[in-house]
A protein has these predicted regions:
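N-terminal binding-site loop/beta-alpha segment at the start of enzyme catalytic domains
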Residues: 2-87, 243-246, 285-286
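Structural preference for beta-strand elements that scaffold enzyme active sites
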Residues: 18-22, 66-67, 89-93, 123-126, ...
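Alpha-helix-loop-beta-strand connector modules within alpha/beta enzyme cores
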Residues: 46-55, 76-100, 141-157, 207-225, ...
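Acidic (Asp/Glu)-rich catalytic clusters
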Residues: 58-62, 79-89, 111-121, 172-175, ...
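Active-site-adjacent beta->alpha loops and helix N-cap segments on the catalytic face
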Residues: 72-89, 104-110, 131-148, 165-169, ...
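Glycine/proline-rich, positively charged
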Residues: 98-179, 222-223, 233
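Catalytic alpha/beta core domains of metabolic enzymes, predominantly
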Residues: 159-246, 250, 255-263, 282
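C-terminal helical cap(s) of enzyme catalytic domains, especially alpha/beta-barrels
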Residues: 262-286
């Protein structure tokens, strides 16, 4: 089992145990990031029925993966709750947004989604990356700080996610009392990587989520909070073997990876291999 082979003492965030490889939620939720292949999201949704999602959760647990990252506003969170009622143990790291940015409607209070995540039993909750960036652009770090303080008050782990290094850097500089950061990291060694005119923190064509990987690695070396790296395969454009190795070598403490059920066993093996051969200078922060 993944967690047993590598031990658990170094895999804890504030006493809560997490596997080094975590299950991303985009594939089961249909967020394909498939560039101009518009049918892929529909294919994902048709494949990942409630039964298939449950099978995926069960297989992940058997392989030693003990956490999944899901939004609280999508129906897949309800599937996870049913899985728990049947005895499932996989932990939820929940994505949430404040009321003024909430997707799906129906949010009255600023922090309704964060309260919902805590109430449903999330092990950790983080501000979703696009929310972080919108609040940063609007110069509303006070809202981010209020989110962090609220989740902390509920005795739940809290984090901040970002695609933009500048947004994350400002959160770190503000010394927010987070338990972890979640930051994108991937190389540009794939065909649809950013072109020279794509200088923003996101690719213009739903094709990039980390425009400055070297700078990210250098900055995260200075951050003493646990780092969950996501989009390490650039939404499926980079094979898992080099993607996992690059992430762990670059200092990530955990890797969040979207996986279909039939990919999980192989991806766990690739993660084992990456950790066995890891060469990193950033200390393990969890």
């Amino acid at each position: 089992v993944f967690g047993v082979q590598f031990g658990t003492a170094g895999e804890r965030i504030k006493g809560v145990e997490f596997s080094r490889l975590m299950l991303g939620g985009n594939l089961v939720s249909g967020y394909a990031h498939s560039r101009d292949l518009s049918y892929v999201a529909h294919l994902m949704k048709r494949y990942n029925t409630e039964t298939k999602i449950t099978e995926t959760l069960e297989l992940a647990e058997v392989q030693g993966i003990n956490a999944i990252n899901l939004t609280v506003w999508d129906k897949e969170a309800a599937v996870l709750e049913k899985h728990w009622k049947r005895g499932g143990k996989i932990k939820l790291i929940a994505q949430a947004l404040p009321g003024q940015l909430a997707w799906g409607g129906g949010e009255k209070g600023d922090l309704d989604q964060f309260k919902r995540a805590v109430d449903m039993g999330a092990a950790a909750v983080h501000l979703q990356g696009h929310g972080t960036e919108k609040l940063w652009e609007d110069q509303r770090l006070d809202v981010i700080a209020r989110i962090v303080d609220f989740v902390k008050s509920q005795k739940c782990l809290v984090g901040v996610a970002a695609h933009s290094l500048d947004a994350l850097r400002e959160c770190v500089t503000a010394k927010l009392d987070v338990d972890f950061y979640q930051k994108t990291l991937h190389t540009h060694q794939y065909y649809s990587s950013p072109r020279p005119d794509e200088t923003g923190f996101l690719g213009k064509h739903d094709n990039s989520w980390c425009n400055d990987p070297e700078e990210v690695v250098d900055f995260m070396h200075t951050v003493d909070k646990p780092w969950i790296a996501f989009k390490v395969m650039a939404a499926g454009a980079i094979p898992p073997q080099p993607a996992f190795q690059h992430a762990f070598n670059s200092g990530a403490d955990f890797v969040l990876a979207g996986m279909f059920d039939w990919q999980i066993e192989d991806d766990v093996d690739y993660a084992r291999q990456a950790l066995a051969g890891v060469r990193r200078t950033r200390p393990w922060r969890a």
